[in-house]
């Protein structure tokens, strides 16, 4: 099992949690981004840079992931593709996307897009606070404990 991170939009506090977990659990974490970013020296943490462009990082993640891998993303269409390929997706607020909930989440996202396109001000998500950070860490720990077998 590997962890892939849609890194361009991933909050720094979430990356820090991922870096600590990578070393503690000895799980490979790969950040995929369209620009260089600093990562700590670790045999478990990698950075894959891709060219700039719409969904280039997303497409690379889908191409590289294997069934059973975990993808960290707030991008709901990417999460849906990951699940279709047999992977798992976790958003930075600690919500695990599953086969059971992804369709309704995708429908709500599409509805909100339609509302915004018609001029309705829907606002964006609030900044990640302590409770979301804790929810993410807890969900990540549960997932890794259940699914990762260190070699």
Curated annotation (Swiss-Prot):
InterPro entries listed in its UniProt record: UPF0178
Pfam families in the record: DUF188
Family matches, as PANTHER family: UPF0178 PROTEIN YAII
The family this protein is said to belong to: Belongs to the UPF0178 family.
Name this polypeptide is given: UPF0178 protein Spea_2958
Species the sequence originates in: Shewanella pealeana (strain ATCC 700345 / ANG-SQ1)
Source organism phylogeny: Bacteria, Pseudomonadati, Pseudomonadota, Gammaproteobacteria, Alteromonadales
